Amino acid sequence: MAGGVTGGAAGTWSDRFEQGLHPFIEAFNASIGFDLTLLQEDLDGSIAHARMLASVGVITEAEAEQLVEGLETVRAEAASGSFQPGLADEDVHFAVERRLIALLGPVGKKLHTGRSRNDQVGTDLRLWLRRRLDGLDQDLQRLQGALLTQADRHRRTMIPGYTHLQRAQPLCLAHHLLAYVEMLERDRERLQDARKRVNICPLGAAALAGTPVPIDRQRTAKELGFSAVYANSLDAVSDRDFCVEFSAAASLVMVHLSRLAEEVIAWASEEFGFVRLSDRCATGSSLMPQKKNPDVPELVRGKTGRVFGHLQGLLTMIKGLPLAYNKDFQEDKEALFDAFRTTRDCVEAMAILFEEGLDFRVERLNEAVEQDFSNATDVADYLVSRGVPFREAYQLVGAVVRRCLEQGCLLRDLDLSAWKELHPAFEADLHDALAPRAVVAARRSEGGTGFERVDEQLQRWLQRFNGTQPVG
């Protein structure tokens, strides 16, 4: 038809259109600026598709070989920098197809038989995320390993424990660090579980209804390493649950990193003084020469909101979409890519911080647990062990703490006669029981902060990381 659209992606739309896109709309519509990230996955998917087409007789083996060679040529050109898609290509799929046709002529036009960009992009996204999930799992393990090394180093170091950011009870520092190891393990489990749903292949669903071409979906899925194919073609091209699920799991990773970052920020302050930051993981002030700023954990804390935002954006984008594919889905990629990269970078930054970026100030930590009333609960426990009802013991100790505050002293400063005046159950062994190290050691319940229990927890984790025993 005279006046039909030619060239670039628009040329692929057939002669249905008589006018080209407005230049601004062409740029607005294009995703090539960011979906080129999927190039390797797009090439992998196309190679598997070409081989499948030959296996069912839709194209010849010779044509499939040409297509595979052409696609590998595009891969090599991309590696060398000579493959340079432009705005007219619209997206990575058209860019590859255009180059393939330029390399192979009419044979290149056969690659898209039996598929649509709708199932193609869904396949690319899943391949991309599956590969990155495996790498992120290794990054999380690295951070766990850094925390375990610190915990192993501080089996007998104590640290104040807090509730409501008020001194509560003394803890073993290793116990505190192991809490984050446990959180990260749940993160790994969530991501591994999400991977199961990433690993389902939509290729072959075509635009929305399947295809009359006698394709073999199972063969393509197997070659690409998928565990299954989508059972419903509409669902296959409409599903972005896996993007949301990853972003939700990544958001929880960031929650845990942010909580740890917040503690490091506080610990590094002069008010706490629990850690010393190394020069390799801190910055200075442009005005105040005495400053050493905890930029790494501050950035992790700040970037957490960015990942949350991507999750909310994906949910909002998907919630009103009718079946099947809609152009709105173009917005899933930048959110997914950035949520992943931000999470990965924050995990790595925190791993480096705990590997070589901070030292715990043991003397300061051990001093800190001596300067408060965090052993008050142990006075109540002492009375309970001698038959005093807990609530009565609790009320008595509360009154003692108030008296100490009025007199400007600590519980350990009261002599035995003063304790005896309060209750006859107190004996000379009370002062030993109130020592912070004794307080920590007494927490022997399963999962508690008692040194022996922490040794058990730590040994279990170290064996897990040495590959000798699973964590149950």
Curated annotation (Swiss-Prot):
Name recorded for this polypeptide: Argininosuccinate lyase
Broad class of enzyme this protein falls into: lyase
Top-level lineage group: Bacteria
Recorded GO MF terms: argininosuccinate lyase activity
Alphabetized UniProt keyword annotations: Amino-acid biosynthesis, Arginine biosynthesis, Cytoplasm, Lyase
GO biological process, alphabetically ordered: arginine biosynthetic process via ornithine; L-arginine biosynthetic process
Major localization listed first in the record, in broad terms: cytoplasm
Pathway: Amino-acid biosynthesis; L-arginine biosynthesis; L-arginine from L-ornithine and carbamoyl phosphate: step 3/3
